[in-house]
Amino acid sequence: MASPFSGALQLTDLDDFIGPSQECIKPVKVEKRAGSGVAKIRIEDDGSYFQINQDGGTRRLEKAKVSLNDCLACSGCITSAETVLITQQSHEELKKVLDANKMVAPSQQRLVVVSVSPQSRASLAARFQLNPTDTARKLTSFFKKIGVHFVFDTAFSRHFSLLESQREFVRRFRGQADCKQALPLLASACPGWICYAEKTHGSFILPHISTARSPQQVMGSLVKDFFAQQQHLTPDKIYHVTVMPCYDKKLEASRPDFFNQEHQTRDVDCVLTTGEVFRLLEEEGVSLPDLEPAPLDSLCSGASAEEPTSHRGGGSGGYLEHVFRHAARELFGIHVAEVTYKPLRNKDFQEVTLEKEGQVLLHLAMAYGFRNIQNLVQRLKRGRCPYHYVEVMACPSGCLNGGGQLQAPDRPSRELLQHVERLYGMVRAEAPEDAPGVQELYTHWLQGTDSECAGRLLHTQYHAVEKASTGLGIRW
């Protein structure tokens, strides 16, 4: 079976699937307990293991398990095992939480929140032949029907990701004379790209990557911090699910950086792909078009939830376009009416320039797919990268073509993608600077745009993963 992960996470082997208990090659140090003597191991007919001590006592031995954190911190392979993700993050986990809620009084229930990405919404709209607004409302109705309390749109959290990316670029552009690694600034919203960068290029590439959190993880901060305060709950009392176009988002949600040590909870507890939501609809015997629409929920009083919104600049979030427009205005006082993209080798590598009197003031690019990412990294290593900013996405054609999106067996993939792109573009685009509720949250929740609180909740850090040298990784 083909792996659902992005190409950047499948580099070291033709078949990157590993069963962690069989093929994980990371050596584990086992501490010897004081006083432990010689013991025998007995294997039962059912495959279970028992330790027999010298005094005749027996103890069942637990199977070694590889957690998702183990995989993320290991350099033995590029990706994590699909089996780990399936057991820890799936629609079955959501159903368990919803079933558990039904067994207790409302005051003892966990508050279940689902945040839906615009890309997943467009994919579902294509499958059910609906427009994106009806899809959003009917999906809200479905989740409420099965026991979810609140349903949000991650386009709202993307406002913050875009604004922080814009500010970071302007700050780095102004400070490039003092720091050689200030530019180019590379987008950080794609977890497949981040995982590849940490494990393959490490300390060389990481200083170039934007520290702005992705929309998923900003939504994690909004739900587990701001919204939890509004509901007078601690973060661990909220179960937060996101619906994403990409399996790699499961890896992102599992990063230790997004784990609250005080309350022992993640910012995002479970990530469902678009395909898993479709499977959930099938298992519940629900046809999305047959549902009555329900209004979307709003995170704060100033934010409108009448209809879903989106952003200009393509199906991956529009990072290049928003950074370009903001930088042109902020750095050079130029208001860009229309952004003109120039395709280079292929449609997944395009560039944009801002010129004045024949001089190039800004040079930005987008690089989608592993082939283009490789070319970009090689140019950086040779010191021949002409760009100030690059929107990097691991999937060819970007997030609308993510591995978790719905496929149509009776329809060519290119035709389906074009249809999804059209549906995605039907949603009203909103400038993050003008979005209702955003400035209110910067003022009252984050205590300002450049505050310590904004840095902690809207930004993250990256970690180079050192290569482990072990003969166990050799395949003969």
From Swiss-Prot:
Q: Under the GO molecular function aspect, what terms does this record hold?
A: 4 iron, 4 sulfur cluster binding; metal ion binding
Cite the Pfam families for this sequence. Fe_hyd_lg_C, Fe_hyd_SSU
A GO-annotated cellular component: cytosolic [4Fe-4S] assembly targeting complex
Example GO biological process = iron-sulfur cluster assembly
Keywords of the record: 4Fe-4S, Acetylation, Iron, Iron-sulfur, Metal-binding
- Could you name the domain of life of the organism this protein comes from? Eukaryota
Residues at which [4Fe-4S] cluster 2 binds: C190, C246, C395, C399
Subunit details: External component of the CIA complex. In the CIA complex, interacts directly with CIAO1 and MMS19.
What is the role of the protein in this entry? Component of the cytosolic iron-sulfur protein assembly (CIA) complex, a multiprotein complex that mediates the incorporation of iron-sulfur cluster into extramitochondrial Fe/S proteins. Seems to negatively regulate the level of HIF1A expression, although this effect could be indirect.
Q: Which family does the record assign?
A: Belongs to the NARF family.
Q: What is the name listed in the Swiss-Prot or TrEMBL entry for this protein?
A: Cytosolic iron-sulfur assembly component 3
Upper classification of the source organism reads: Eukaryota, Metazoa, Chordata, Craniata, Vertebrata
